[in-house]
From Swiss-Prot:
Any one Pfam family match given in the protein's UniProt record, by short name: Nanovirus_C8
Entry superkingdom: Viruses
Protein's UniProt name: Putative nuclear shuttle protein
Cellular component GO terms held in the UniProt record: host cell cytoplasm; host cell nucleus
Cited InterPro entries: Nanovirus_C8 (IPR008706)
Localisation: Host nucleus; Host cytoplasm
Main localisation: host cell
Family (UniProt): Belongs to the nanoviridae nuclear shuttle protein family.
Signal peptide range in chain numbering: none
Length: 153
């Protein structure tokens, strides 16, 4: 991995908005290097990490909400597997709005095969909300995801 340190760093950023957390919502995102036809030679891509931050709110009184923000990745064999979880939730005594927020970085270090100059690097991810207790239509969440990528010619 040391030979990657001098390679240029690029990021791929996504925002997933969940206005309601009823029914275990999920969104699909695509990490892409957008380097198709920009270089003269073939290249390799190193997917270094996936950084996740979120904030959200819930409403109610005497309410305990709890769940997990799950990030999954479609691997080379076509199977979607979790790369990590971030807990979400909180508790309210009074009828009011409660807020939750969090952040986590998942180190991936996934190296691609050589890509031709006329193709993009693509990796599909799935952002899911897992309800463990009380996440419903009175809960919302906005998720920000940044993939760090290194490119080596």
């Amino acid at each position: 991995m040391a030979d990657w340190f001098s390679s240029p760093l690029k990021t791929c950023t996504h925002v997933c908005d969940f206005p309601s957390l009823a029914g275990d919502p999920q969104q699909e995102i695509m990490c892409c290097d957008s380097m198709k036809n920009k270089l003269q030679d073939s290249r390799k891509v190193l997917l270094v990490s996936c950084s996740v931050s979120f904030n959200g709110s819930f409403y109610g009184g005497n309410r305990n909400v709890r769940g997990q923000l799950q990030i999954s990745m479609v691997e080379d064999d076509g199977v979607c597997r979790p790369i990590g979880y971030v807990p979400i939730g909180g508790y309210l005594y009074h009828n009011d709005y409660g807020y939750y927020e969090g952040t986590r970085t998942f180190n991936l270090d996934l190296e691609s095969q050589y890509l031709k100059k006329d193709e993009d690097y693509n990796r599909k991810f799935l952002v899911s909300i897992l309800n463990e207790n009380g996440l419903d239509s009175q809960c919302d969440l906005k998720v920000f995801i940044v993939h760090s990528i290194r490119i080596k010619v």
